[in-house]
């Protein structure tokens, strides 16, 4: 019975954190369409979707291994956390020489101008790095028992994204850069807060790295990379084709319409997160 109570409790906590943040984002759509043109919305969303595909490639989906091995009592928590951050750092450095591939994602604007995401490579790479780092920290605090902090962090990131969106888009008029920079800054602030509140610096140790554990975590995480990529490609491919064959204005309309159905998929993901946490905890105790 305690297992079911824990599962329901975790599901409720994740639901509060996830749905509150997603609803706030949907409510902000009117603001985005008011301060950004359809072309700017289309390009900005292409950047977001491209980053979502690069994220599992650069991080090697190590965040999933962090929570999987971090929940096991026999594992040393500092080893798991350190390996998670080192994997992100190594993946990021290895990916840097491949930035010219961003030129393959090109688009046309409604005014007839053409461009590619290579023009935004610095913005994209910074976004990937902050997103991967934040994910490792977020998954690790779940593993060490900060479940409520994990949910609150989701709300905090969304709130900061909205505040920074208003500042960067309405006040500074940074347009595409402001839209993406607000997400980057919110992820960075989230990482700093998690480090301070959960004292994550205590778990980062470069001495005596457990390479056997590193290998085990990679063997667990690597098969998850194709699955993560394909999930994002389903939504990205349609938008990329529209931006290339039509224009970014058309892809922006498609992107806005696509956000509402994604809420349905969130219901399943919330339960899966809670179920994974409860099951691993149960097996560990046994």
What are these regions (language model features)?
Residues 19, 82-112, 268:
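Alpha-helical transmembrane segments of multi-pass membrane transport and lipid-handling proteins
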Residues 63-66, 139-143, 147, 167-172, ...:
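C-terminal transmembrane helix end/exit motif
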């Amino acid at each position: 019975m305690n297992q079911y109570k824990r599962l329901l409790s975790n599901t409720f906590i994740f639901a509060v954190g996830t749905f509150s943040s997603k609803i706030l984002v949907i409510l902000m759509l009117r603001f985005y369409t008011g301060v950004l043109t359809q072309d700017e919305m289309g390009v900005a969303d292409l950047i977001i979707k491209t980053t979502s595909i690069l994220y599992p490639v650069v991080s090697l989906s190590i965040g999933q291994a962090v929570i999987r091995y971090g929940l096991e009592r026999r594992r040393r928590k500092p080893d798991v956390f350190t390996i998670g951050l080192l994997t992100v750092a190594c993946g990021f450095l290895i990916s840097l020489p491949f930035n010219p591939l961003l030129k393959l994602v090109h688009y046309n604007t409604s005014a007839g101008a053409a461009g590619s995401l290579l023009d935004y490579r610095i913005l994209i790479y910074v976004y990937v790095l902050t997103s991967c780092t934040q994910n490792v920290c977020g998954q690790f605090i779940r593993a060490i028992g900060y479940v409520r902090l994990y949910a609150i962090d989701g709300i905090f990131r969304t709130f900061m994204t909205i505040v920074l969106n208003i500042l960067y888009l309405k006040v500074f008029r940074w347009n595409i850069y402001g839209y993406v920079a607000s997400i980057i800054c919110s992820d960075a602030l989230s990482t700093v807060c998690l480090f301070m509140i959960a004292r994550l610096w205590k778990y980062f140790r470069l001495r005596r790295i457990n390479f056997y554990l590193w290998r085990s975590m990679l063997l667990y995480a690597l098969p998850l990379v194709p699955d993560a990529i394909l999930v994002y490609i389903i939504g990205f491919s349609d938008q990329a084709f529209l931006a290339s064959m039509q224009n970014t204005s058309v892809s922006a309309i498609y992107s806005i319409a696509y956000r509402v159905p994604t809420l349905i998929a969130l219901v399943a993901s919330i339960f899966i997160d809670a179920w994974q946490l409860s099951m691993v905890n149960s097996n560990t105790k046994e």
